[in-house]
């Protein structure tokens, strides 16, 4: 049993990218679905599909690679706020990742969103992870 399901999710994606897998299957939860939707909307993954094959269900994610160089689009994905040490940031303090080339995923009172969207709405929250 793992104590941090989001870290497990990010590690599965990171390992699949490192092994050049085309698809990764992850146990589902509402938070994981929202993170996956953000990754899709931002162009980091090709597609995703929710499957209700068990009580919990699973998410199948098709990873995205560059057509010419075959390099993965996701260079790194890092967990920031952890169960033992939560990291919060106000709207003004939300970080820019690699000068705007990456994204921060933030859990706000208005839902899960990118750091850029949170700044536009002037809301802060818990910084879940960085993707670049």
From Swiss-Prot:
One of its GO terms (molecular function) is rRNA binding. Signal peptide: none annotated. InterPro entries: Ribosomal_uS8 (IPR000630), Ribosomal_uS8_CS (IPR047863), Ribosomal_uS8_sf (IPR035987). It holds the Pfam family Ribosomal_S8. GO terms for cellular component: ribonucleoprotein complex; ribosome. Belongs to the universal ribosomal protein uS8 family. Part of the 30S ribosomal subunit. Contacts proteins S5 and S12. One of the primary rRNA binding proteins, it binds directly to 16S rRNA central domain where it helps coordinate assembly of the platform of the 30S subunit. This is Small ribosomal subunit protein uS8. It comes from Flavobacterium johnsoniae (strain ATCC 17061 / DSM 2064 / JCM 8514 / BCRC 14874 / CCUG 350202 / NBRC 14942 / NCIMB 11054 / UW101) (Cytophaga johnsonae). The gene is rpsH.
